[in-house]
Every structure is written in structure tokens, then in C-alpha cells.
A protein has these predicted regions:
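Short, well-ordered alpha-helical microsegments
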Residues: 23-26
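N-terminal glycine-rich "phosphate-gripper" loop used for MgATP/nucleotide binding
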Residues: 17-21
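Iron-sulfur (Fe-S) cluster-binding modules
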Residues: 2-15, 28-68, 72-145
Length: 145
């Protein structure tokens, strides 16, 4: 907030903010009377897989289950965001909704097995109601101009 004072005092016509949507909102809130515009569209929190390709990693759901699922997020990695195990529709380890993706729950099972924590699969977690979304998303610049 204190760092915004020189900007506000300069009375610019507008502010173009190079940040995620939260940053744009923060600047707008602290720059009264100054229009604030995003320079980019925030898609999601993800990780770079290789140049020009990112994969979604977190939904900021506020009810993190990573400690129970071996560090693999079922809300983000499962297309149906199932938190208590697989849907049963996977084929050859691939997701039935998006066959390009590995089944999140097979990945979770393998990870928990690897770290000696398969007992965590027996815990029931409350459904988060994220079924209306389709995750994980991937953004690729390949073929874009």
C-alpha cells in the first residue's frame, strides 16, 4: 500500500498491471480514481513442463489435501475433481474425460505406495463439488501466432 503512494500522487491516466488477477485487484483497490487494466489473462497456477507448455498445478481451493494424497492434487489433476478415489472410467491408466491425461488416482496410488503411505487411501474426504469444471488444463503456444 505504501509503495502505491508515488503512483497515486503522479495521477496517471491509467495503470497497466503485469500480474495475476489478484495483483490487478490489489492495485485497483489501492489506486482510487485511477483505471487499472491487466496486461495479461491469468489462466491458473501452474508449472512449466517445457518451453511454451504449462500444466495446471493448484486451484487455490482453500482445503488442501496434498498431505493425504502424496503431493498430487486430485482436485486439479482429476478431470472430475474426485477426492476419494478414481471414478472407474480410466482405460490403460488414462483419464476417461481426457485420454491425453494420466488418471490422477493411479498417480496418487503409485506415489503413496512409493512413500509407504497407502493407508491414507482409506480416509474419506468430503466432496468439494468441483465436478462442473474440467481439469487439469494445459496451455501450449505450439501452433499459436
Amino acid at each position: 500500500k505504501g509503495k502505491m503512494k508515488p503512483l497515486v500522487a503522479a495521477k496517471p491516466d491509467c495503470v497497466i498491471c503485469m500480474s495475476c488477477g489478484d495483483g490487478v485487484q490489489c492495485v485497483a483497490k489501492n489506486a482510487p480514481g485511477i483505471p487499472t487494466y491487466p496486461s495479461n489473462n491469468t489462466m491458473y497456477l501452474g508449472e512449466a513442463v517445457r518451453f511454451g507448455v504449462w500444466e495446471e498445478a493448484c486451484h487455490f481451493c482453500g482445503d488442501c489435501v496434498l498431505g493425504q494424497t502424496g503431493g498430487i492434487c486430485p482436485i486439479t489433476q482429476c478431470a472430475k475433481s474426485l477426492v476419494n478415489g478414481p471414478c472407474g472410467g480410466q482405460k490403460n491408466g488414462k483419464c476417461e474425460v481426457n485420454p491425453e491425461n494420466d488418471c490422477a488416482w493411479i498417480k496418487i496410488y503409485k506415489r503413496l505406495e512409493e512413500i509407504g503411505q497407502l493407508d491414507k487411501l482409506g480416509k474419506t474426504r468430503e466432496d468439494k463439488g468441483y465436478a462442473k469444471f474440467s481439469y487439469p488444463r494445459t496451455i501450449s503456444l505450439k501452433g499459436k501466432k
